[in-house]
Structures are given as C-alpha cells and as structure tokens.
C-alpha cells in the first residue's frame, strides 16, 4: 500500500509547487487565526489556483463559527474539512462535506488506548481520523506521541482513513510509517525552514523516506 502524504500549513505559491512536484497527495490550509500559518479565505483562494487536479485541498479549522466555515467553502471549495478543536460530531457533519477529525493523543480522556478508541467511534462518519500529539494549545504541536495509544483504533481504510501526524519529519517518518501503517501522514513543521515557510529539500527528503518504507512493504 502506498502511504498518502498531506503537507499542511502552506502559505506560499512556491511551496505548493514544491509539494506537488515531490508527489504530495493533499495540501492543507490553516484557517485558525492563532496559528502562524493562518491564511484568510481570500488568500487561500489565490493559493488554491496553484493546486492541480487530483491533489486534494484540505481546510483546517479550530472551533470555527459556521459562517467562517461557509466563507471558506464559498471562496476556496476545499475537498475536505479538518476539525482540530472541540467540535462535536454534529459540528463536523453539519456542512454535508467529507471531513477529518483530529484527536490529540495524550489529552485528558485520550491518554489511553481505550479512551482514544472510544472517542474515535463517536465520529464514525468521518472520512478519516487524524492523530496528533497533545499540547495545551490547539493545532499541531510539532511533537511526537506514543503510537501505542493507537493500539485500540480500528478503521476500515475504504470508509475511514487513519492519518498520522505529530512531529513527523524526514528523519523519523519512516519509523513512524513502519510502526503504525497509516493510510496517510500529515506533516507541517517537519518540512519547514520557519513557520509557514516550507523547504523544498525537506519535502523531497520526506517523500523519499516514505517511499523507501512503502517499497519494502509491497
């Protein structure tokens, strides 16, 4: 199985080009104002024009108002929504769009394999469950987490993908993919020179590391 790759937190046209040329399957835009990688709908609409067909655009939100999500739907037309805050299943599903639900592994209630698995089951209609590490704030932490917490998570890739995030970079992504065998990985700070500024070289290194694992697994 080929591991899919999402590069998140893009803010520049040249970084979209680098990700696409390296073989990324999805591009993520962050619509969380507190993030250093935040873009507004107008800017995201400009960037979206650089994304070719067959590369998905994912819109990341943290506890958004419905009108904020609607503005992104209207201006950007993302392929997937991603919810990274305290959104309920009803919050995530109200837009009638495919969505990813992010879980901060290690957070209170999500600090055991059983607790994390139970939380996932509440979002059975999600297109994917994304697992990130816990930090006091919202959004990606850039830190890893104990992948043993995923032991109780069961998902059918045909209906709900497992997406691994949390401190992934070219130096550790191969081991992470080998251990978890996720449908996809989601990487942001691990391929950056600065927040929101991606490194074409690091993106290529990341893709090569993932490909090396996938080839052995065939």
Swiss-Prot record:
HAMAP family: PRAI. Pathway: Amino-acid biosynthesis; L-tryptophan biosynthesis; L-tryptophan from chorismate: step 3/5. CDD domains: PRAI. It is an enzyme of class 5 (isomerase). Disulfide bonds: none annotated. It comes from the Bacteria. It holds the Pfam family PRAI. Signal peptide: none annotated. One of its GO terms (biological process) is L-tryptophan biosynthetic process. The keyword Amino-acid biosynthesis applies. It catalyses: N-(5-phospho-beta-D-ribosyl)anthranilate = 1-(2-carboxyphenylamino)-1-deoxy-D-ribulose 5-phosphate. InterPro entries: Aldolase_TIM (IPR013785), PRAI_dom (IPR001240), RibuloseP-bd_barrel (IPR011060), TrpF_fam (IPR044643). Keywords: Amino-acid biosynthesis, Aromatic amino acid biosynthesis, Isomerase, Tryptophan biosynthesis. This is N-(5'-phosphoribosyl)anthranilate isomerase. Gene3D superfamilies: Aldolase class I. Its EC number is 5.3.1.24. One of its GO terms (molecular function) is phosphoribosylanthranilate isomerase activity. Belongs to the TrpF family. The lineage of its organism: Bacteria, Pseudomonadati, Pseudomonadota, Betaproteobacteria, Burkholderiales.
